[in-house]
């Protein structure tokens, strides 16, 4: 049984999350076309202004991580107390979704997320895709 503090992060279905700083947003960004990425980059550059280079660096790192390891991370970037991993799932109808695992950083340190959990998440996404959903 998890301690009560382990269940503090509650998210409702349909909650909107920032693309640039969450593992869910980053996973989605890594799965879309280059053309779509450019459209999103332009929109976020206008939205974030002087903060855009930092946000873009996070997206670029996520893309690198995804290409090398099959997952994206957000280590305290969306919320300084939350670490998360994300992977895209491609459905047969062309829909792209993100599968994520997030937890308080004191329960799941970055090393555990990067070294174990994120890899398992990527394998789970592959299993789901192989079901032909």
Please tell me what each predicted stretch does.
Residues 1-43:
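Amphipathic alpha-helical effector-binding/dimerization core
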Residues 29, 33, 118, 122-129, ...:
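Short amphipathic alpha-helical signal-transduction/dimerization elements
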Residues 40, 111-113, 133:
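Short linear functional motifs in flexible/disordered or boundary regions
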Residues 44, 51:
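Acidic, glycine-rich loop-and-strand cores that form catalytic or ligand-binding grooves
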Residues 52-127:
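Extended hydrophobic
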């Amino acid at each position: 049984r998890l301690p009560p503090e382990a269940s503090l992060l509650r998210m409702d279905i349909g909650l909107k999350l920032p693309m640039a700083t969450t593992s869910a947003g980053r996973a989605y960004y890594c799965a879309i076309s280059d053309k779509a990425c450019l459209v999103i980059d332009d929109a976020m550059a206008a939205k974030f202004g002087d903060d855009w280079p930092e946000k873009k660096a996070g997206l670029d790192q996520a893309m690198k991580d995804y290409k090398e390891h099959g997952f994206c991370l957000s280590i305290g970037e969306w919320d300084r107390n939350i670490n998360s991993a994300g992977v895209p799932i491609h459905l047969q109808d062309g829909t792209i979704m993100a599968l994520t695992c997030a937890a308080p950083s004191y329960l799941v340190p970055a090393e555990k997320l990067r070294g174990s959990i994120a890899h398992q998440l990527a394998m789970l996404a592959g299993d789901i895709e192989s079901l032909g959903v």
